[in-house]
């Protein structure tokens, strides 16, 4: 969840580190710091707060060193303050460490180090690593780091400087992402590609327990036993501009405007001669015939995509589907075997709870199909089959375009499995595919008409509590709409199945309560109209979202009707979520919230 950047080369390190950290702000953080090795001295500057605060402190320093590490911290051990910020230095000032992850046995290690005479200044688990590297360091930094990673338990991405090693530094990872960027006379490390994309497109993706040694002219990688590893160079195929705002006020709005393109990019390469072809999924008819159940496992927004996936896969494939929150799945001893398929969904491909859930399912014999957005990510590498969502980099913490492409990918998976199982015909599949291809045009129309949503938000942004209700696929939409609103506007919100209102929720409805009702399912339209009448009778204000064809009828009961272009009920969630995203965006904007970087949240959750 933190951001790590490291540099060694011929440039001054500080500008490279600050630039890289600024590209990782989307990951969420509460403090920042850098360490530079200059003439055999480690200079560490760090502070609580935004990166701009760190830049102010650096103006008073003259740090010209050409090797350094930087970090943005999101607190897991110890409150956000200057002392707990990274980098952490060892007792003698010989070692500096940045760390992302959680060291589970840090208390035992801390007690050992205290017994050896080490004093601790912070409340973090990371300080243990700095002291432990110093404890083992006898002139060989690589050997010391190897010994440390053999002792620590938990997850980590590490960058380690030593004042005596002026021409090299070391990094390592386990269960937390870290990449190495390869330059000409310079090399880099980073938590994510945007931090170093300005300098190189060639990277190494480190595997668990691999250690990399960086000099200006070389990168050597070793496994946990110290044996050299020949790494394959991965070439990044997207541009720096893809991770910039491009004239928009916020990344979130830019990314909503990118939804039509990324949906097309996710569909079009997989349609050949008018038929769906998923080359990356090698599940045969025989494999499908053996399937007794499908699990979908994810967190947050990706979980809500999975709820839609359950409806679609069960309808098109007639296979039971269970949707699980990843953090619950791995601890509840799920009944998994080789007759199951587990679909893993993650934008980053590094979500730690989801990664561990994947490994739990795989250990029990399940086949793993992942839907991820980052090529070469940990989840992708651990999967049997991968379907990439070509959403490009998503910088805003609140997911928008990645969610739309996750939905799109789930529809493609359902079509592929249904065709192979014989539960849908080619004609039915082609009709659904044609409907999916129309979705981008519909979203473009929604974005053109966004002013209606903006006006409604202006009139209702002071709402204290907002309820979302829907049925079937619209209930899944309600879950996501409610989460988006909570994430970025900090307004309390809950989502309920429409049929559950009378079972308790309606007690919360009073005069002026705002209720949002996605209504895209033709078969359930009248049921939802009844729900609207129920809440209206108790004084609620109702915002409804439906196809254009229903507008006139719905205006008789709802206070405000937002429309999406007419689309089949089955595929409607992909376009109907865009008005919900816009609603959350404008509510947050009216309240003066930081839309792209909401409080307490991180983009990529790489700790449990």
Residue ranges: model-predicted function:
Residues 289-431, 435-438, 520-560, 583, ...:
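Glycine-rich phosphate-binding loops that contact phosphosugars or nucleotide phosphates
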Residues 259-263, 267-295, 385-514, 588-608:
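Active-site phosphate/pyrophosphate-binding segments
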Residues 226, 541, 567-608:
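Generic C-terminus detector
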Residues 155-186, 456, 461-487, 522, ...:
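Acidic/histidine-rich
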Residues 1-249, 261-292, 304, 331, ...:
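Conserved short alpha-helical segments that host acidic/polar catalytic motifs at enzyme active sites
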Residues 4, 97, 160, 171, ...:
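Structural beta-sheet core signal
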Residues 49, 70-83, 272-285, 309-345, ...:
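Glycine-rich oxoanion-binding loops at beta->alpha junctions
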């Amino acid at each position: 969840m933190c951001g790590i950047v490291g540099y060694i080369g011929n440039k001054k390190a500080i500008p490279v580190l600050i630039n890289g950290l600024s590209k990782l702000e989307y990951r969420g953080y509460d403090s920042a710091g850098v360490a530079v090795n200059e003439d055999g001295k480690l200079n560490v500057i760090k502070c609580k707060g935004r990166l701009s605060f760190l830049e102010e402190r650096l103006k008073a320093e003259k740090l010209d060193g050409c090797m350094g590490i930087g970090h943005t911290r999101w607190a897991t051990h110890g409150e956000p303050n200057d002392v707990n910020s990274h980098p952490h230095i060892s007792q003698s000032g010989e070692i500096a460490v940045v760390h992302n992850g959680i060291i589970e046995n840090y208390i035992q290690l801390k007690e050992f180090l205290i017994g050896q005479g080490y004093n601790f200044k912070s409340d973090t688990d990371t300080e243990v690593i700095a002291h432990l590297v110093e404890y083992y360091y006898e002139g060989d930094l690589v050997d010391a780091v190897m010994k440390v990673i053999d002792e620590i338990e938990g997850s980590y991405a590490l960058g380690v400087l030593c004042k005596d090693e002026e021409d090299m530094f070391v990094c390592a990872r386990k269960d937390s992402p870290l990449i190495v960027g390869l330059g000409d006379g310079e090399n880099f490390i980073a938590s994510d590609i945007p931090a170093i994309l300005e300098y190189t497109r060639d990277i190494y993706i480190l595997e668990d327990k691999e250690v990399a040694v960086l000099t200006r002219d070389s990168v050597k990688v070793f496994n946990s036993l110290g044996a050299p590893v020949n790494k394959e160079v991965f070439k990044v195929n997207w541009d720096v501009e893809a991770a910039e705002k491009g004239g928009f006020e916020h990344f979130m709005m830019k990314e909503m405007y990118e939804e039509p393109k990324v949906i097309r990019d996710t569909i079009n390469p997989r349609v050949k001669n008018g038929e769906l072809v998923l080359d990356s999924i090698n599940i045969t008819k025989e494999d499908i015939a053996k399937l007794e159940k499908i699990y979908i496992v994810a967190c947050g927004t990706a979980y809500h995509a999975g709820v839609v996936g359950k409806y679609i896969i069960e309808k098109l494939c007639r296979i039971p589907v269970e949707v699980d929150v990843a953090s619950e799945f791995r601890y509840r001893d799920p009944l998994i075997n080789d007759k199951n398929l587990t679909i893993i969904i993650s934008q980053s491909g590094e979500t730690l709870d989801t990664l561990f859930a994947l490994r739990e399912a795989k250990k029990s014999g399940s086949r793993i199909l992942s839907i991820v957005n980052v090529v070469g990510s940990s989840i992708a590498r651990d999967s049997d089959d991968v379907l990439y969502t070509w959403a490009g980099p998503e910088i805003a913490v609140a997911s928008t375009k990645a969610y739309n492409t996750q939905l799109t990918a789930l529809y493609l998976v359902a079509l592929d499995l249904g065709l192979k199982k014989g539960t849908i015909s080619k004609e039915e599949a082609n009709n659904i595919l044609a409907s999916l291809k129309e979705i981008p045009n519909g979203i473009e129309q929604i974005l053109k008409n966004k002013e209606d949503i903006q006006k409604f938000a202006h009139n209702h942004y002071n709402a204290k509590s907002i309820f979302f209700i829907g049925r079937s696929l619209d209930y899944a939409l309600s879950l996501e709409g409610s989460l988006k609103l909570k994430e970025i506007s900090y307004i309390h919100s809950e989502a309920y199945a429409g049929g559950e209102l009378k079972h308790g929720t309606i007690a919360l409805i009073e005069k002026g309560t705002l209720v949002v009702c996605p209504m895209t399912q033709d078969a359930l339209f009248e049921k939802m109209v009844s729900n609207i009448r129920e809440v209206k009778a108790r004084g609620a204000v109702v915002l409804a979202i439906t196809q254009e064809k229903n507008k006139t009828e719905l205006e008789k009961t709802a206070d405000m009707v937002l429309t999406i272009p007419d689309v089949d009920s089955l595929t409607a969630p992909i376009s109907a979520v865009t008005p919900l995203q816009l609603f959350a965006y404008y509510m947050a904007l009216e309240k003066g919230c930081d839309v792209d970087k909401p409080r307490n949240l991180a983009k990529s959750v790489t700790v449990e």
